[in-house]
Structures are given as structure tokens and as C-alpha cells.
């Protein structure tokens, strides 16, 4: 039996095409993936992300524990509500998962991890927490709705109470705040402004309906994938996994090397990889006809005339740009051109930073 979110019936009411997503019945689209994509880039769309795993880490050792668990450093979070993005690494510096951590108080952090990795993540966190004075509590009774797009905040404001709007007024990106029964965060997976709203399950359907009534377009997994790829955001299991270190996944910016005495899990292995040099994740742009796809080989020749090979990790047609884009893991000698093998012939592609669209505009 597949898991169903509390919003399952709301999806059916909007004629969603449901698919299995790592054991969850989730909407692929509600008729047109392209229209849903454009709604987020041009107006406002919303996603049911209630399958995500919310974990509260509470106790006197919460900060110390998360400083060991994560490659990024939660001690950098000084203002209540501030969040950071991090990899959670194994001893070999492989990425167990990528996640967001919110600093709420010195003894209370909220961590949001992926759904596909839930059991593995919870087991790892439980194992590593031994000896720390903390409690780790999963919050399955909470649903989550992401409202994204240039008009998302205004449309959400029409649904929030006056007190809730006052609580989040002027909130900067990458913050979260408890406002009444809602935990409202300025985070997302689309490259647009908006909120991710954690809501008690018994209020989720009413919130979804209220957003629908404000003209927020429901969006499925299809649009979520094209939006996140345009924004250059990794998908766990495709762009990185336990065989990949964060330096090879365009996540170097999420590693807090200082202070040098913070012994986070995987640090020694990661330092060795850094010193030896690793592959890197780049963006590819192909303006010819055709679509770049996961697992296609990428070829380039370095300055010495030696040919190297990499592989596409994620690829799609970009509805915003009108041509194909991809992320690829390649040796770090790559320049600004390469070739991709498609239908037994090689096609030229441009190599760019893995960030294609931000706030509705081309970003490279």
C-alpha cells in the first residue's frame, strides 16, 4: 500500500495524475506540467510536500550534536529562525542526504529531510545521537505546502491571519517562524520567492483550498523537477548519493571548514578528497533540438589534448529557456565546451555554472 498525504483527496478533486514516488502516491501533474511550470515562474504555484520528513532535535546538546552530524555549521546560526542547507555525510564523506536545519532556540532545531531517505536518515541520526543529551522527534502529524512564484507571498498573505502576516513581515530568505499553528519558512526548491508552510494535518486541506481560492495553481512532481533543475538545485539519488562527496556535487559552499577543530562526520575523508582534487558538477546548455537526459555520456578535450568523459546526472527541456539543460559530473579540467552523445552521434553543448534560471530570468 502506498502512503497517501492528507491532501490526497484534494489532488483528485483537481484531476491530478497520481504516481508512485518512493512509496508515496503523489501528483505528477494536474493536466499540464508546462502550464504548472510557467505558473511558478510567472505567478504562483503550490506543491504538496507533506511526504518530506520533519524532525525536531531538542535538548542541551542539540547544537553540539548537529555540529558533529552536519558538514555545515549550525553554530553560525545566531538569529532565531535562521536556516542553513547542508549535507549529512558518512565517514567516507559520501552524502547520506541533503537537508535544511532551522535554528529556533539554543536547545531546539528543526531539520527537514527527504522522503525517499527517511528510514536511512532516521536510523543514522539515532545512531549518531548516542551520548548526546537530546531527543529526536519525528513529526508525521505535520503536513507541508510549498507556495512558490513572484506572486506567491502576496497570495499567501491573503490566506494568513493578521497576526501571522505581522509575525513574518520582512522575513529574509532562508528563515522560518512559528506563526500561530503554521511554521512559515522562506525556503523553496524552485528558484523563486515564496514560502514552505508546515501545517498541522487537520488544517492542511483548508489551507490548500484557501490557496486554491486565491488563484494559486496546484503543481505536481513534473513541474517541481523542471523548476529545481532550472534553478540548479540537486535532486538526491540523481545528482548525488552516498557514492558522491559534496565537493563533486556543487555543494562545496555548504561545507564549514572553519573552525578547524570541529570534527564533523566525514571531515577527514573530505579533507583528503579536497586535497587530491575531485570531479565537479557543471551545467550544460544545448540549443539544438533534442533533450539532454540522465546517464548520457559527456566528452571534452583538455588543454593538453587528452579526452575526458563525464556523465549527465539530471537533464530536461527547460520550459523557461526553450531548450535543453542538464547537470553533469565531469573531471575538473573541463573548459566551456563539451559534447554529449545522443542517438549515437556527438552534439556540442555549452558548459556553464549549474544555475540556469533565477527569479524568472536566465542566470548564466
From Swiss-Prot:
The superkingdom listed in its UniProt entry is Bacteria
Q: Which GO terms describe its biological process?
A: glycine decarboxylation via glycine cleavage system
GO MF terms here are:
aminomethyltransferase activity; transaminase activity
What EC number(s) are associated with this protein in UniProt?
2.1.2.10
**Keywords, comma-separated and alphabetical:** Aminotransferase, Transferase
- Give disulfide pairs as residue numbers: none
Q: Which reaction does it catalyse?
A: N(6)-[(R)-S(8)-aminomethyldihydrolipoyl]-L-lysyl-[protein] + (6S)-5,6,7,8-tetrahydrofolate = N(6)-[(R)-dihydrolipoyl]-L-lysyl-[protein] + (6R)-5,10-methylene-5,6,7,8-tetrahydrofolate + NH4(+)
Q: Which Gene3D superfamilies match?
A: Aminomethyltransferase beta-barrel domains, Aminomethyltransferase fragment, Probable tRNA modification gtpase trme, domain 1
Classification via Pfam families: GCV_T, GCV_T_C
Q: Which SUPFAM superfamilies match?
A: Aminomethyltransferase beta-barrel domain, Folate-binding domain
Cellular component annotations (GO), alphabetically ordered: cytosol; glycine cleavage complex
Quaternary structure and partners: The glycine cleavage system is composed of four proteins: P, T, L and H.
**Family stated for the protein in its record:** Belongs to the GcvT family.
Q: Per its database record, what is this protein's job?
A: The glycine cleavage system catalyzes the degradation of glycine.
Name it. Answer: Aminomethyltransferase
Native organism taxonomy: Bacteria, Pseudomonadati, Pseudomonadota, Gammaproteobacteria, Alteromonadales
